[in-house]
């Protein structure tokens, strides 16, 4: 069975207009989490004053993407960003998007909501109907397929923080199983209103000072953040550029837990990774680095680290390096998996 590879990648992350800027900030240890009023007044409703924000989400080349001005003004900025960054990802793979028209290319997008849709729908007398088309999560994938004339599967996935990696898994398996020859996989998250943050704060999930102190004793919650990342997956024979090969992908869920539905299970994470490695012949000692979920919460970090230690550190080996993008840029929730993947791909590309 032919290998599936990452053939192109593009993204916008906090204070980073593209992946080159993102990489430079990672290398220089720049804190991409900021305190300003680009979304709402810092400290409103007692919220943490800092979060991770994209530089500018106000502009969109509507005519280029075949979007009528009336539609563009009521289209979720998340979808506008996905259209733009998907184009960049395909070009990054050395492919002219026009050559993919009519092909079985699929689209999978990880996203968890549309705060813009709620805002655009507040006044029934002002509704034009376009916000329903521009803000439905189904359209996050379908509009991409429509613009490029892709004929493969097209769907949006919401599994909260794992959404974009679930999208990646589904796309990978679709290519492996012959449902499509290539796939555009995206993850997106924007913070457009304070209400969602207030709910997370009330649940005790947010760091009061707006920082993900990953794997640190001072960890007291996570910092919310924005991101949009898109990768192009293809069969190896189709790729003009190869960043990395995906050797396996899978998922499970924790089931019932006494501590509640939001409590993570390090044991289930360990079981999943162990089974995936066993399927493709990877030994624990072969792994040199793990890019973790690592959000800086008092509950999640210990569960994850203990699971990794049980899996990878029960044999003689060199030290296992671990890390998390969230200590640099905050937690972009449904887009976090692809943001982490971007960091790893960039590290490989630069020989680190």
From Swiss-Prot:
MF terms in GO: 3-oxoacyl-[acyl-carrier-protein] synthase activity; fatty acid synthase activity; hydrolase activity; ligase activity; oxidoreductase activity
Record's keyword terms, sorted: Fatty acid biosynthesis, Fatty acid metabolism, Hydrolase, Ligase, Lipid biosynthesis, Lipid metabolism, Multifunctional enzyme, NAD, NADP, Oxidoreductase, Phosphopantetheine, Transferase
Active site: 161 (for beta-ketoacyl synthase activity), 293 (for beta-ketoacyl synthase activity), 331 (for beta-ketoacyl synthase activity)
Record-listed E.C. numbers: 2.3.1.85
Catalytic activity: acetyl-CoA + n malonyl-CoA + 2n NADPH + 2n H(+) = a long-chain fatty acid + (n+1) CoA + n CO2 + 2n NADP(+)
GO BP terms in the entry: fatty acid biosynthetic process
Domain Ketosynthase family 3 (KS3): 1-352
One Gene Ontology CC term in the entry: cytoplasm
Main enzyme class: transferase
Pfam families (UniProt xref): ketoacyl-synt (PF00109), Ketoacyl-synt_C (PF02801)
Expression induction or repression: By triiodothyronine.
Gene3D superfamilies per the UniProt record, alphabetical: 3.40.47.10
Function: Fatty acid synthetase catalyzes the formation of long-chain fatty acids from acetyl-CoA, malonyl-CoA and NADPH. This multifunctional protein has 7 catalytic activities as an acyl carrier protein.
Subunit composition and interactions: Homodimer which monomers are arranged in a head to tail fashion.
Cross-referenced PANTHER family: FATTY ACID SYNTHASE
Official protein name in the record: Fatty acid synthase
Species: Anser anser anser (Western greylag goose)
UniProt lineage: Eukaryota, Metazoa, Chordata, Craniata, Vertebrata
């Amino acid at each position: 069975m032919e290998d599936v590879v990452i053939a192109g990648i593009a993204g916008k992350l906090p204070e980073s207009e593209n992946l080159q800027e993102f990489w430079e900030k990672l290398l220089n240890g720049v804190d991409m989490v900021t305190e300003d009023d680009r979304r709402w007044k810092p400290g409103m409703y007692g919220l943490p004053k800092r979060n991770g924000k994209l530089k500018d989400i106000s502009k969109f080349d509507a005519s280029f993407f075949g979007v009528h001005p009336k539609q563009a003004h009521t289209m979720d900025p998340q979808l506008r960003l996905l259209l733009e960054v998907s184009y960049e990802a395909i070009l990054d793979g050395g492919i002219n998007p026009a050559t993919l028209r009519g092909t079985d290319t699929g689209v999978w997008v990880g996203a968890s909501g549309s705060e813009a849709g709620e805002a655009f729908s507040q006044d029934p007398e002002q509704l034009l109907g376009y916000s329903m088309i521009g803000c439905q999560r189904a359209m996050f994938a379908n509009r991409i397929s429509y613009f490029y004339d892709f004929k493969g599967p097209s769907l949006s996935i919401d599994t909260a923080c794992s959404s974009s990696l679930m999208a990646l898994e589904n796309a990978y398996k679709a290519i492996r199983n012959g449902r499509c020859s290539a796939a555009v996989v995206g993850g997106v998250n924007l913070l457009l209103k304070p209400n969602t943050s207030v709910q997370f704060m009330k649940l005790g999930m947010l760091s009061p000072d707006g920082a993900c102190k990953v794997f640190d004793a001072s960890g007291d919650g996570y910092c919310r953040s924005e991101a949009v990342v898109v990768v192009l997956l293809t069969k190896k024979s189709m790729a003009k550029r190869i960043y990395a090969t995906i050797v396996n992908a899978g998922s499970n869920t924790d089931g019932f837990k006494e501590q509640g539905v939001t409590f993570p299970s390090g044991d289930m994470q360990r079981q999943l990774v162990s089974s995936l490695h066993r399927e493709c012949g990877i030994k624990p000692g072969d792994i040199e680095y793990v890019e973790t979920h690592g959000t800086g919460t008092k509950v999640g970090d210990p569960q994850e680290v203990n699971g990794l230690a049980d899996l990878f550190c029960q044999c003689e080996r060199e030290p296992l390096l671990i890390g998390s993008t969230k200590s640099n840029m905050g937690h972009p929730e449904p887009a976090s998996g692809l943001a982490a993947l971007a960091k790893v791909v960039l590290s490989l590309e630069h020989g680190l």
